[in-house]
Amino acid sequence: MGRTYRTIGINLKAMPLGESDRLLSVFSRDRGLLKLVAPHSRGSRSRLGGRVDLFVVNDLFISPGRNLDRILQAETVATYQGLHHQLTTLTAAQYLGEVVLYQIHPQQPQPELFDWFCATLDQLQGASSRAALAILVRGLCGILRLGGIAPEWYQCHESGCKIAVPTADTDWRLGFSFAGGGVFRIRADHPVGNESVAGAGGDRQLTASEVRLGQWLAMPTTQFLARDEFLTQAEAYPLSVWLSLERVLRQYLQFHLEQPLRVPPLLDSCFSPVAVSQP
């Protein structure tokens, strides 16, 4: 066992361990994924208290162990309490946290992903349901970008030709390939599914509005817009389009992860059919 060490980390997952401990999955900015024992953290008199709660950022002092390292001391840096004001913002945060947990690994620092995730959680605080959805989708796009698997929106992944999107919604459709990692022109000999995943490649159709939104989110200027300016510009796209693009990204993520995500179905219950039909 080595010396104690210090790191900044955010709690992504917690589970009971033994009679009184918790096992935390912590995303450390400079160490990647850490599995840490939070000793005696399940008791009412725990000195760690709320420091082991979900999405709390702590300055941690850690003692290396033979199998698992142990938290000696934790000083809270951020808590994101505004996530708990409504179900949609909390669900969006849990959605992002689940995806991030799949992207991180022990001893592999990802400071850009850490900063992006924390910034997105901060933007979600106090957001309306519609705003939370837009922030979530932008957050997912950033995670995909930092993971090196961002979809291609501006050119056909098969031919390399640039995509010209109509300014108004028509019967125009574009294909989206999960295996190919982006959009493609639909051919008569290449049938594409609509809402459901079709074929081994997981292809589906996108409308002009969905492609325009994907292209807008892929722009570097959009990725780093301040929260209020981003939400103002996001109003140009109907709620139904945001919901549709979220499902595309969800399926795309699940295709690459080769397993279903647990949290996203909870997001569906946050939006009633009546709300989805409104712009």
Curated annotation (Swiss-Prot):
Which named protein is this? DNA repair protein RecO
The free-text function statement in the UniProt record for this protein reads: Involved in DNA repair and RecF pathway recombination.
Whose protein is this, by species? Thermosynechococcus vestitus (strain NIES-2133 / IAM M-273 / BP-1)
Signal peptide residues on this chain, from the entry's feature table: none
Q: One short Pfam family name for this protein?
A: RecO_C
Q: Does the keyword NADP apply?
A: no
Which keywords belong to this entry? Answer: DNA damage, DNA recombination, DNA repair
Cellular component GO terms, alphabetical: bacterial nucleoid
Q: Hey, which family's this protein in?
A: Belongs to the RecO family.
Source domain of life: Bacteria
InterPro entries, per this entry? ARFGAP/RecO (IPR037278), DNA_rep/recomb_RecO_N (IPR022572), NA-bd_OB-fold (IPR012340), RecO (IPR003717), RecO_C (IPR042242)
Q: Name one GO biological process term.
A: DNA recombination
